Amino acid sequence: MAVGKNKRLSKGKKGLKKRTVDPFSRKDEYSVKAPSTFQIRDVGKTLVNRTTGLKNANDSLKGRIFEVSLADLQNDEDHAFRKVKLRVDEVQGKNCLTNFHGLDFTSDKLRSLVRKWQSLIEANVTVKTTDDYLLRLFAIAFTKRRPNQIKKTTYAGSSQIRAIRKKMTEIIQREAASCTLSQLTTKLIPEVIGREIEKSTQGIYPLQNVHIRKVKLLKSPKFDLGALLNLHGESTTDDQGHKVEREFKETVLESV
């Protein structure tokens, strides 16, 4: 018999259920808000552990990245193949204020674009916006048949591909470097840059399915709360005056 053990002591009964605590009882629900550049502002809900001791719930929420379909943000099924990344930058009450963090295509859409008998042309550009966001934009384009073309294939020559890629790079650089991140987002939603590339390269070789397939955020500037609140249509101070309901009339005293 080992030293320190007493056989007469009754052991605890095995198989007794431990008291289970519902983990969701310790969590709070927060609303995720998209910037005002999108039509639908309410992205959804997210859960986080309540503030206990030194662990602050707001710190756990900041930096969270949500991937949302652009179709849900714009209420338009035509954008279903594009995914937008939103990053939580600030927490106001029970609302998580997000900012644009990137854009991507769904893999099934990319695979459906690649076909036989055509050339695929890709380009990527690293550009800085006017509000100091460093982004990398990836463009994709495909050649198409010329009007009245009999030949089955639409392969572009290597010199034509180089010329098209150069033109793509110039247009992306010009369009992205001359605007803020929110203005660039408004250009990406209706695919303004893709249409501009398609129009300007008609003289080199006709293109189709020209898209900015991916936007990657490389570096963000120092966090500015005022800029984020303006992006969400809010403000830290009420600078706007209130409209007066009726015309003000000065009262004239008859006697002093």
Curated annotation (Swiss-Prot):
Q: Which InterPro entries match?
A: Ribosomal_eS1 (IPR001593), Ribosomal_eS1_CS (IPR018281), Ribosomal_eS1_euk (IPR027500)
Give the sites modified to N-acetylalanine: 2
Going by the UniProt record, its keywords in alphabetical order are: Acetylation, Cytoplasm, Ribonucleoprotein, Ribosomal protein
Listed under GO cellular component are: cytosolic small ribosomal subunit
Predominant location of this chain? cytoplasm
> What's one GO MF term for it?
structural constituent of ribosome
UniProt subcellular location: Cytoplasm
| Region (Disordered) residue spans | 1-20
Compositional bias per record (Basic residues), positions renumbered to this chain = 1-18
GO biological process terms, semicolon-separated: translation
Q: Which Pfam families has this protein been placed in?
A: Ribosomal_S3Ae
Q: Provide the assembly information.
A: Component of the small ribosomal subunit. Mature ribosomes consist of a small (40S) and a large (60S) subunit. The 40S subunit contains about 33 different proteins and 1 molecule of RNA (18S). The 60S subunit contains about 49 different proteins and 3 molecules of RNA (25S, 5.8S and 5S).
Q: Which family does it belong to?
A: Belongs to the eukaryotic ribosomal protein eS1 family.
What's this protein's name? Small ribosomal subunit protein eS1
